[in-house]
Amino acid sequence: MSIIDTRTPEPKRFISGATGDWEVVIGMEVHAQVTSESKLFSGASTAFGAEPNSNVSLVDAAMPGMLPVINLECVRQAVRTGIGLNAQINLKSVFDRKNYFYPDLPQGYQISQFKQPIVGEGKIMISVGPDNKGQFEDVEIGIERLHLEQDAGKSMHDQHPTMSYVDLNRSGVALMEIVSKPDLRSSDEARAYLTKLRTIVRYLGTCDGNMDEGSMRADVNVSVRRPGGEFGTRCEIKNVNSIRFVGQAIEYEARRQIAILEDGGVIDQETRLFDPVKGETRSMRSKEEAHDYRYFPDPDLLPLEFDQAFVDALAAKLPELPDVKKQRLVETLGISVYDASILVTEKAIADYYEAVAEGRDGKAAANWVINDLLGALNKAGKDIEESPISPAQLGAIIDLIKEGTISGKIAKDLFEIVWNEGGDPKKLVEERGMKQVTDTGAIEKAVDDVIAANPDKVEQAKAKPTLAGWFVGQVMKATGGKANPQAVNELVKSKLGIEE
């Protein structure tokens, strides 16, 4: 099958070499474990973290006479994912045997799909950026196919000095292999693609996307060429298990290939591994050593067939996907595309934000969730589900600012108190004397005191009105941040004779 080049060369994506510009071409094969209670062809549990070899049926262990039975839920999840990828759903697909030997593959073959996958071509839109002007670029990435297959078990080589062990708990777990077209042109695009793909499957509930647990991992195909030239020889980097590592692996591999070509060498088509400690790829095996998998239809499984009504019923019940949610947040709550992009990255974050923003100013809610809450969660190493501050509590803090009960500075202090101690924000403001000072007389005295203590600044402010902000800051400091900032600003300008 010939590969079609769908991208026009873009100079901003080029890599500068010693002999001129180069273009990197990237395709990805993402293995996503299907979210289901049981495995693809057996009733064994898929629970992560169980004791070794405790979630293994006779089918998973390939005992003689044991026949596979398709798990309908895995089929549903694959179709739902295909719909979410704007892809063609194939009403007939076939399971094939992929023949190779490995200790953690007890059957001696993997049940996969080769010529007739369950999902055909699709596409997703990624946002790359921001650039130095703060702008994002939307790029369409083609999906070649999605097929269902069995995961293999796990070989463990660190349990004994002279022996290796095999854990078959993962053997037979359903995988969706999602294959992109070679449309990616930079490590940034690859990271954005993998992030978007993970977001989509998490919204759909078809894969948990936990790369640290191995439930989502990527094989990355990398080649380089002169801009707009023929495709180069590609190398495949296997089983990269984090988005950050994907970017690092691509950057290293592209530079490695460029250095070889500029030295007059040739690229060997091979499989490589990424070493995250050294930040480099190393050879695993050459393609010349690769197996002839001898695919043929599995005689124990009939072709998988369903009708369009089955697909339509699943499509009708899909949740709101990230692109649609982002557009809705921008249109209904008036927030920026940038803020909306951050908020929809995780469904739980988007749900939290919408709970905070309900009945409130969308921009203020976005500012607090993105800058304060997510910043605090990141610092504490917590997920949004572990937030010590509930949407109701954060919403109450925003309400207190809008009502003029507390200033923005006091709100930050209140946020810290609620984060560390919990409690009702409104009661805490009362109990701890955090209310904003709105008594004009008290504020005026504070303004007079600051002006009297800084006669030199007064003269400077008359020539340079922007210095009024310095006086406002001093008054806020003197009142412990409790003075109404607007009242302070008006009084300072009035006292200094600065006109609006």
From Swiss-Prot:
Listed InterPro entries: Asn/Gln-tRNA_amidoTrfase_suB/E (IPR017959), Asn/Gln-tRNA_Trfase_suB/E_cat (IPR006075), Asn/Gln_amidotransferase (IPR018027), Asn/Gln_tRNA_amidoTrase-B-like (IPR003789), GatB (IPR004413), GatB_C_1 (IPR042114), GatB_Yqey_C_2 (IPR023168), Gln-tRNA_amidoTrfase_suB_CS (IPR017958)
Keyword Cell cycle in record: no
One of the protein's GO biological processes: translation
Record SUPFAM superfamilies: GatB/YqeY motif, Glutamine synthetase/guanido kinase
EC number per UniProt: 6.3.5.-
Catalytic activity: L-glutamyl-tRNA(Gln) + L-glutamine + ATP + H2O = L-glutaminyl-tRNA(Gln) + L-glutamate + ADP + phosphate + H(+); L-aspartyl-tRNA(Asn) + L-glutamine + ATP + H2O = L-asparaginyl-tRNA(Asn) + L-glutamate + ADP + phosphate + 2 H(+)
Pfam families per record: GatB_N (PF02934), GatB_Yqey (PF02637)
MF-aspect GO terms: asparaginyl-tRNA synthase (glutamine-hydrolyzing) activity; ATP binding; glutaminyl-tRNA synthase (glutamine-hydrolyzing) activity
The protein's enzyme class: ligase
UniProt-listed SMART domains: GatB_Yqey (SM00845)
Keywords: ATP-binding, Ligase, Nucleotide-binding, Protein biosynthesis
Family to which this protein belongs: Belongs to the GatB/GatE family. GatB subfamily.
Subunit structure: Heterotrimer of A, B and C subunits.
Function: Allows the formation of correctly charged Asn-tRNA(Asn) or Gln-tRNA(Gln) through the transamidation of misacylated Asp-tRNA(Asn) or Glu-tRNA(Gln) in organisms which lack either or both of asparaginyl-tRNA or glutaminyl-tRNA synthetases. The reaction takes place in the presence of glutamine and ATP through an activated phospho-Asp-tRNA(Asn) or phospho-Glu-tRNA(Gln).
UniProt name for this protein: Aspartyl/glutamyl-tRNA(Asn/Gln) amidotransferase subunit B
Organism annotation: Brucella canis (strain ATCC 23365 / NCTC 10854 / RM-666)
Lineage of origin: Bacteria, Pseudomonadati, Pseudomonadota, Alphaproteobacteria, Hyphomicrobiales
